[in-house]
Amino acid sequence: MSNSVLVFFVNGKKVTEVSPDPECTLLTFLREKLRLCGTKLGCAEGGCGACTVMVSRLDRRANKIRHLAVNACLTPVCSMHGCAVTTVEGIGSTKTRLHPVQERLAKAHGSQCGFCTPGIVMSMYALLRNAEQPSMRDLEVAFQGNLCRCTGYRPILEGYKTFTKEFACGMGEKCCKVSGKGCGTDAETDDKLFERSEFQPLDPSQEPIFPPELQLSDAFDSQSLIFSSDRVTWYRPTNLEELLQLKAKHPAAKLVVGNTEVGVEVKFKHFLYPHLINPTQVKELLEIKENQDGIYFGAAVSLMEIDALLRQRIEQLPESETRLFQCTVDMLHYFAGKQIRNVACLGGNIMTGSPISDMNPVLSAAGAQLEVASFVDGKLQKRSVHMGTGFFTGYRRNVIEAHEVLLGIHFRKTTPDQYIVAFKQARRRDDDIAIVNAAINVRFEEKSNIVAEISMAFGGMAPTTVLAPRTSQLMVGQEWSHQLVERVAESLCTELPLAASAPGGMIAYRRALVVSLFFKAYLAISLKLSKSGITSSDALPSEERSGAETFHTPVLKSAQLFERVCSDQPICDPIGRPKVHAAALKQATGEAIYTDDIPRMDGEVYLAFVLSTKPRAKITKLDASEALALDGVHQFFCYKDLTEHENEVGPVFHDEHVFAAGEVHCYGQIVGAIAADNKALAQRAARLVKVEYEELSPVIVTIEQAIEHKSYFPDYPRFVTKGNVEEALAQADHTFEGTCRMGGQEHFYLETHAALAVPRDSDELELFCSTQHPSEVQKLVAHVTALPAHRVVCRAKRLGGGFGGKESRGISVALPVALAAYRMGRPVRCMLDRDEDMLITGTRHPFLFKYKVGFTKEGLITACDIECYNNAGWSMDLSFSVLERAMFHFENCYRIPNVRVGGWVCKTNLPSNTAFRGFGGPQGMYAGEHIIRDVARIVGRDVVDVMRLNFYKTGDYTHYHQQLEHFPIERCLEDCLKQSRYDEKRQEIARFNRENRWRKRGMAVVPTKYGIAFGVMHLNQAGSLINIYGDGSVLLSHGGVEIGQGLNTKMIQCAARALGIPSELIHISETATDKVPNTSPTAASVGSDLNGMAVLDACEKLNKRLAPIKEALPGGTWKEWINKAYFDRVSLSATGFYAMPGIGYHPETNPNARTYSYYTNGVGVTVVEIDCLTGDHQVLSTDIVMDIGSSLNPAIDIGQIEGAFMQGYGLFTLEELMYSPQGMLYSRGPGMYKLPGFADIPGEFNVSLLTGAPNPRAVYSSKAVGEPPLFIGSSAFFAIKEAIAAAREDQGLSGDFPLEAPSTSARIRIACQDKFTELLEIPEPGSFTPWNIVP
């Protein structure tokens, strides 16, 4: 049969593709074939939602059009036949009309960098197409599959809450809509960041119609399809016989419905499946049949359809019949994200046979019956298969044979004496794979609590889902009681062992979870037995009952308070007003252009990297011949294409290489690069390059290993001292020695590193680069190409996030791309895939601190001797400066008269770690907060009282000899304690902890003091350029880069006030080295401080030139003045410059200067609740008070505070980097690396800006805001530690206990020692090789 023609619709337009590639995704097709670049590539594994589009199809079974949010990165374009695709461009634009979904997100300040915005817009749009007025729960579900690294999620939810049934203020009866006044406001403060009344209403009648051509005829559905390429053939049969014949002919063929598993295997494991079968038009696999015994679902029915029908039946049928249904929907809620559940099917989940499948334990415990069919000897054969013991025969294998097809699954109704419950524990609740899950199905003897039959299934404990038959048999005939729990716990520990080196790690935790999840099931079933009257109400102690519960996402409550602008401030003066991000509307419509959105150029090639697969080794052979033999592959680049000098690069020290030269120092180091016609071909060719190695030792991965081998960079350690530490420690009432440790953190900007290099005339090179430091890229590109800098221009219009990760590491991509473009004489492009980016570009520095502190019996700290170690990776990068800031911030807000702080930069065989928001400050302050809590614990005082006792006062000196001016930390503290109802909550928490054994709450107060300036003096400068045109419009250029932090918006505001004109007259096009030269990186939170003052400098020059004209025409307009100036030959272009004064401290050469220009302070109070049985936790509330001077833009600044808090929360609680003992990064995408999602924000999230605190040392009395709030996220960590301490007290354990950051569920559970953890035998460290280690 010849190739079929692919037909589908995109944004109402018919698309016909004659020879579609079965390996092509919908995302690739949209971006490269149709140039619809609003849909973004964020991860390629369906984990971030940046690629979300809406797919509409007519369900002819129900005669209903279904609108589904899907991940375009996983959706095969071949599966779109007969469908209608809607992208963000298709619902509205700034040139025509904004859709309310786009408008509300933008105007509610829900878009910062904007890279995730189109995906979030489309998730919401798809929801509204299915429910005109959704509930808040619908919103929660809709965004399970979307991530945002910038905003902290609050403003997105606030904007979209206006569409919901429950739309109302979170303050309930106290709402200002009821009382008539603002939430907590007074004459000085405001709380409205956006005006809801300005939103255009949603009018469903205006939505695009489903294409009539698809609706009127079933021709697209009834047609069997074949799409073939030279590697893969895609089949879409339309009846069961055709499907079974294909499977008989190609037994190894993969059946693809949602492509959520196969797509990941093909992309990341590089599997090649020559035959793919799409069975979505075979009615037998789509059937839903109901009878008195239960419901039968076809194997290809989507998980969302299953969920919806089961929820309906739960509402309609008696509870006793729907316990399996309820158990299923409970598990489905946490099964991936909605985009995945919309297309994934239960049959795929069963047949994939993942050992951590969420549904297989439920189906195995329930003994589900499966229907299977095959075509043998020309005949259709069917048989039934029982899911239970023996069904899974090995890793991803089961008893269903290769030529057979799973037709469907029976869900039986439960009986009155039957109970089935399931629990799942993951790193993060929403959209995460299980660490361990469990399902327990028990049937009791009639109207009793005597076990008649029980089946228990567990995931995450073996290569397959496993049952526990021996333990189950032990329970038969036994009374369901606490005595049974003890026996079961011991038996499960024996029956389900786990090797100390088992893949996945967390051995003790996983073994503890098996017992703990059973116990949660015991509690849940006991409560149901009690409720039904079978057991007495007091059979289960009241304090144990909450142990049966799981966390649920509450409806968000929030408040944002900021200083009201003066009533006499001109309306056109935007300073201090909550203005919308300048690019927010374009970001919400997909019109905003990022580096990889730039249209492909004639002759352009793609560059793909060959990466090291060894942590430390000599390269003995490098052979690209096989790769170069492929059609469309043009050239291979390696160290041989550069001189030794040209190949040596680095941001400060040239201790790195463009391409590894003779030796590799870590996994993921760039060895070479392949230039080819397109990305897929270049990456395939790169995998064909043969690299042979001679491995070297030792391989050093961890800080402890570096200390053991004395593997430090030259000139370290370094020390900073103040006073006499030895003497003070000797005289102290108390001394204490401690250690604390924290891991690294992946930046996870949604836009990965990208660069496009274009050769121009006269040996010029033009680079478009996702970098925070265009001048550094310019300088190093000139270095590797041996060009003068004036021949190289680097441009950065906007970045899809940066957080420091694009300050120095952008050279990893930009330099090879520039070299290839220069040598080949044609445009070259590269945008790293997420796994490449995470492997290559480094992370936040892990730190280890060892300290000895002396203090009085009242808790006044008198001395501290502290050692700081950071894990730099294999090259220096900026690690020396990160260490210095940690050493300068370790004391946080506390005055310590005698200090010795030493710092070591550890050299290891990891990718070079780099700048990350906070730049060592959060790590240093983390040590300081451990110290203050150690002191409080030892002297027996409340930690807040000890904080107050030790706080710096205005006029005090730090240990690096800077005097503190205008230091308002006490005011921040008192305001925050009041705002958070601290004293009242302490009592509530104490009461809760007394009443609950397996749930505990904790609360923590964390202050912060963050120094504002670059640590290297020469970087504290900025330039600007302002051009005024004849029509009065103003083009502003400055040296900062728009990363999403609102820098361009603030610069426009500054210029508008300085020039006295409306913001709408001012435009910023891009950051470019030919506009403003010799720029500093946009980092260190000083973007607004430096560039804002440079902008003012240029404005002042222009104002001076225009002053005589304004005097001559006092009643004139701006345009008239500019027109007059032009004809008077007055220059309407000016440059500005600013150098931060009074800084550059050095103890010998500049002892009277400051290290930092000033400090930004704040305080946060966070309350958490933990599940002591699983280690799960939930942030109940966070209150933050920040001193940011006179805010330039409260909406942007509060957005920065919330986003920084959530990033800090992730750093200290969720985000764990997983490395092999040899230094290979396991966590290379959102599947394993978990940053906070929508459901992780505090249930109550309040931010208040300190009023009446202008800062004289920055533009318009403002303060820096990007980095300072991040450390407040640690308040969740310290609150968790308080909650753990409460759990340990119930176990009779007192005193301190170790808890590393991040405080993952594993660490929380193991720290909550109890009768279950006591059953575990933990092997001694060193007696085995662990699966993973902490760097």
Swiss-Prot record:
Residues 227-416 form the FAD-binding PCMH-type domain. It catalyses: xanthine + NAD(+) + H2O = urate + NADH + H(+); hypoxanthine + NAD(+) + H2O = xanthine + NADH + H(+). GO terms for cellular component: peroxisome. It comes from the Eukaryota. The active site is at E1267 (proton acceptor). Pfam families: Ald_Xan_dh_C, CO_deh_flav_C, FAD_binding_5, Fer2, Fer2_2, MoCoBD_1, MoCoBD_2. It is found in: Peroxisome. Substrate binds at E807, R885, F919. Keywords: 2Fe-2S, FAD, Flavoprotein, Iron, Iron-sulfur, Metal-binding, Molybdenum, NAD, Oxidoreductase, Peroxisome. One of its GO terms (biological process) is arginine metabolic process. Its EC number is 1.17.1.4. Homodimer. Belongs to the xanthine dehydrogenase family. This is Xanthine dehydrogenase.
